[in-house]
């Protein structure tokens, strides 16, 4: 079954010296292909050269990102949520445009695999570094050990754009970031 969802968020207001004026739009859809499922999403939020005056969500104001994306390095995402860039949909007030896709493959009844790709661009220049945050590729496997008990492992690679290397993120002066992750979790 094909599914489509999305949202439109319109923010207006101030908290202390910070404004959160702006809007965001997300469209997401998925379609089965045999036993596999292909999903994609596009998101755009407005920003400001002064991130204290740009679009922010409640998560952004609380310095959290929420699980909203498919990627592992640029965004918080389940088993890799340890040392990611923590992009929330407002990109800290700079605004964000991203296009992402994933493929979910059931290998057996208890084992599944997922591969993903995502492209990220800041709505406004991040300092003097421009807008290109980068592109990410990754994948993971998930094994159901018992009912609600899962073992997950994966890896991800991000090619950083100039804006992705700034101190607003990890302050990494590298052209890429690599990550290997795993999680053993009881889900209920």
How would you describe each model-predicted region?
Residues 8-14, 33, 42-48, 117-123, ...:
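Transmembrane beta-strands of outer-membrane beta-barrel pores
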Residues 20-24, 96-98, 134-138, 177-181:
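Transmembrane beta-barrel architecture of outer-membrane proteins
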Residues 27-31, 40, 101-105, 139-143, ...:
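Residues on the lipid-exposed face of transmembrane beta-strands in outer-membrane beta-barrel proteins
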Residues 148-173:
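C-terminal beta-signal and adjacent terminal beta-strands/loops
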Residues 1-4, 35-39, 109-115, 143-153:
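Repeated loop/turn-to-beta-strand initiation elements of outer-membrane beta-barrel proteins
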Residues 81-98, 102-136, 144, 186-188:
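Outer-membrane beta-barrel transmembrane domain signature
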């Amino acid at each position: 079954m094909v599914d489509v969802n999305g949202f439109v968020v319109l923010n207006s207001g101030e908290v202390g010296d910070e404004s959160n004026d702006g809007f965001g739009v997300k469209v997401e859809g998925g379609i089965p292909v045999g036993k596999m499922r292909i999903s994609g999403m596009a998101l755009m939020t407005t920003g400001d050269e002064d991130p204290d005056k740009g679009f922010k969500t409640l998560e952004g104001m609380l310095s959290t990102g929420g699980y909203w994306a498919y990627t592992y390095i640029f965004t918080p995402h389940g088993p890799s949520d340890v040392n990611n860039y923590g992009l929330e949909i407002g990109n800290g007030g700079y605004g964000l445009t991203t296009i992402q896709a994933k493929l979910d493959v059931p290998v057996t009844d208890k084992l599944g695999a997922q591969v993903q790709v995502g492209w990220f661009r800041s709505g406004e220049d991040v300092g003097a570094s421009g807008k290109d945050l980068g592109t990410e590729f990754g994948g993971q496997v998930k094994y159901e050990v018992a009912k609600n008990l899962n073992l997950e492992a994966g890896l991800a690679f991000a090619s950083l754009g100039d804006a992705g290397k700034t101190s607003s993120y990890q302050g990494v002066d590298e052209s890429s970031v690599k990550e290997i992750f795993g999680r053993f979790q009881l889900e209920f």
